[in-house]
Amino acid sequence: MKKNAPKSFEEALSRLESLTQSMQGEMPLEDALAAYQEGNELVRYCQTKLAQVEQKLQVLDTDGLKELNLESDE
């Protein structure tokens, strides 16, 4: 993120929600483009943070530590 990088995942998510609400209303084209670009950066930031957390989540198994599969239906 360039300017005003979020301090946390929650801050980024809150800003993203705010941008989404703003873009649902009437907004000049240039402002909409700037909001879209900022939103895109925030999405990438959030995806990176989530990937980092997912990598850290591990469960103890009989064979030792293994990665936690969050997409499992178990």
From Swiss-Prot:
EC number assigned by the record: 3.1.11.6
Domain of life from the UniProt record: Bacteria
Catalytic reactions of this protein: Exonucleolytic cleavage in either 5'- to 3'- or 3'- to 5'-direction to yield nucleoside 5'-phosphates
Compartment(s) of residence: Cytoplasm
Gene Ontology annotations for the cellular component aspect, listed alphabetically: cytosol; exodeoxyribonuclease VII complex
Alphabetical UniProt keywords: Cytoplasm, Exonuclease, Hydrolase, Nuclease
Database matches in SUPFAM superfamilies: XseB-like (SSF116842)
A Pfam family of this chain: Exonuc_VII_S
A single GO BP: DNA catabolic process
Enzyme class: hydrolase
InterPro entries: Exonuc_VII_S, Exonuc_VII_ssu_sf
GO molecular function: exodeoxyribonuclease VII activity
HAMAP family linked to this entry: Exonuc_7_S
Function statement: Bidirectionally degrades single-stranded DNA into large acid-insoluble oligonucleotides, which are then degraded further into small acid-soluble oligonucleotides.
Protein family according to the UniProt entry: Belongs to the XseB family.
Entries under PANTHER family matching the protein: EXODEOXYRIBONUCLEASE 7 SMALL SUBUNIT
Subunit architecture: Heterooligomer composed of large and small subunits.
Protein name: Exodeoxyribonuclease 7 small subunit
Organism of provenance: Neisseria meningitidis serogroup B (strain ATCC BAA-335 / MC58)
